[in-house]
């Protein structure tokens, strides 16, 4: 979903984030969102610190969207950061089927962050096109940028435990398979600008 669904307003360069974007020649919110969208996927050196996205030139669904939510807040605008959990499968995340199938699974619960503005879900880390979109979230909640670390991980693990229990599966094994899926995705050459978190 494109940056065009986000509000557009001038960034205040007197504020810390506005100043960082201004130093890159970026003075409007949508331009900032487009810039962040084009940065490659990659875990930051501290995956819970969205402040590292611009300096490290990469980010994940959590760090990129948290940065943009905070940038909006800094400028007195409300753009929500949402944590969702969905069933990751080969259809919505090409490349994970090769890990899931040998483990007897069709899907595993995965956490994903995106932005919400005036009823629109805006995901700047997944490819455009419906075939790779997440069509249904099993859990969604608005979070603050500082919650993308431990809090997000705990929500995700708690959800995986419950999901596994409901299906008579081993939660530890399920989490291990999920980690293998993420590794398989990270190894894909086209992965760099596509999606993901961890």
Task: Please give the residue ranges for each predicted region.
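Second-shell loop/turn segments in exported
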Residues: 19-22, 54-58
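Short, conserved helix/loop micro-motifs enriched in His/Cys and acidic residues
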Residues: 39-56
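Cysteine-centered nucleophilic/redox motifs
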Residues: 57-84
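Short alpha-helical scaffolding segments that buttress acidic/His motifs in well-ordered protein cores
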Residues: 32-36
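His-Asp-centered catalytic microenvironments across diverse enzyme cores
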Residues: 2-24, 41, 82, 86-198
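Transition segments tied to proteolytic processing and entry into folded domains
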Residues: 6-11, 42-43, 47, 67-70, ...
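Alpha-helix initiation and capping sites
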Residues: 26, 58-62, 66, 105, ...
